[in-house]
Amino acid sequence: MKWFWSDPHFDHEAIASKMGRKTEGIDSWNACAIEAINKHVDRHDQFFILGDFTWKRPGYWRQQINCKHITLIRGNHDDGITKLQNVFGAGNIYDLRVVKVRGVHTVLCHYPMAFWDRSHKGSYHLYGHIHYSAPREKLLDLLGDRKSMDVSPEASLDYFGYYRPFNEDDIYTILSARKGHDFPKMLPNGGPDA
């Protein structure tokens, strides 16, 4: 099973309070996030963290996660590539990655995109960074019934009522119900990919 979550921000007090995470302080958030991951993500699953893994102690927080197969999609708080390579392995860190979610081409990036590879053909895009901020999500919704979604803890709280990563079945259920971009009909001559 593939699992996706962005922005855990371990040890990042300012983000935990700014984002209104429903925990009492950073230690409580850290424990809540680790419990949510380990309760749902099996040791042999694939776990994709879409950026902003931790403020400090990446090795410590990686050891707290039981899953053996973790891929980090770097975010704006994921500095120190050498340290991260030592924690995750050089072949497990990307700025952008493409995977299949129930057979659907899916672009993973920390940042939301208006257009992504094959977006006009129904591909998915998973991102973080904006922490499911309503004004930002509404701005993205102006682009139409897009097949992209925020997979942050704030988004999981809204979808499930509690914090947990999204699995590939969640992603497929949510995004397959959306119509998706119809950009070729909106652009002159069908656009560049027609």
Segment roles from a protein language model:
Residues 1-61, 147, 151-155, 174, ...:
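N-terminal active-site segment of His-dependent metallophosphoesterases
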Residues 6-10, 51-54, 76-78, 111-112, ...:
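Active-site metal-binding loops of divalent metal-dependent hydrolases
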Residues 39, 61-65, 98-100:
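Short, conserved, surface-exposed binding loops centered on an aromatic residue
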Residues 45, 68, 123:
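Conserved acidic residues
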Residues 71, 86-191:
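Conserved beta-sheet core of the metallophosphoesterase superfamily
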